[in-house]
């Protein structure tokens, strides 16, 4: 098998909880063992990966690091007020989990990504709901870890009757 240059895109990659960061770490380590060149573009929290995997931080606001409106507003006030920042903050304020939605827009603002996007053989989107530019879409694979509607149906099927 020929060596591929693969970019993993992950809006958050917590190395210790949830499945995304753990899945990302394990898959990337396995691909490096097969001699592929791996770069991860991730928002915080960042994954805990060996130095053989290149890790590029994508700036994200961190609104979901707190559930306090006051703290979220403090984060927003410190941001450069772009159209995206206003939309992100307003949608977050209404309870929408915006990180996977706006990650693609934040990614294309990343200097390393902008400079190197054309050099990757394939992009692997790890659970985002982003609209990506054409440079990505033609070479994109996506992993959806657990569709929320499936989780809901499983939960409801396993609930005892309310009455």
Tell me the role of every PLM-derived stretch.
Residues 16-20, 93-96, 100, 163:
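Aromatic-acidic/polar surface patches that form glycan- and anion
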Residues 25-29, 112, 132-134, 156, ...:
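Short amphipathic alpha-helical segments and helix-helix/interface helices
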Residues 21, 49-54, 66-71, 135-138, ...:
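Short aromatic-enriched loop/helix-cap "lid" or pocket-rim segments at secondary-structure transitions
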Residues 41-106, 110:
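A conserved catalytic-core segment of Leloir-type glycosyltransferases
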Residues 98-137:
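Extended amphipathic secondary-structure runs
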Residues 54-59, 141-142, 159-160:
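Short, hinge-like loop/turn segments at secondary-structure boundaries
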Residues 6, 121-125, 129, 134-153, ...:
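Active-site proximal beta-strand in glycosyltransferases
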Residues 1-60, 118-120:
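N-terminal subdomain of nucleotide-sugar transferases
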């Amino acid at each position: 098998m020929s060596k591929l240059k693969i970019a993993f895109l992950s809006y958050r990659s917590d190395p210790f909880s949830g499945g995304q960061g753990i899945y990302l770490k394990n898959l990337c380590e396995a691909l490096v063992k097969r001699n592929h060149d791996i770069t991860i573009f991730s928002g915080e929290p960042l994954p805990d990966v060996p130095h053989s995997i290149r890790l590029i931080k994508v700036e994200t606001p961190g609104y979901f690091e707190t559930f306090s409106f006051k703290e979220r507003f403090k984060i927003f006030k410190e941001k450069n007020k772009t159209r995206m920042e206003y939309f992100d903050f307003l949608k977050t304020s209404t309870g929408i989990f915006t990180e996977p939605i706006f990650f693609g827009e934040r990614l294309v603002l990343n200097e390393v990504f902008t400079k190197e996007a054309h050099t990757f053989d394939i992009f692997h989107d790890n659970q985002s709901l982003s609209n990506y530019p054409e440079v990505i879409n033609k070479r994109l694979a996506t992993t959806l870890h657990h569709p929320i509607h499936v989780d809901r149906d499983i939960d409801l099927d396993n609930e005892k009757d309310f009455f």
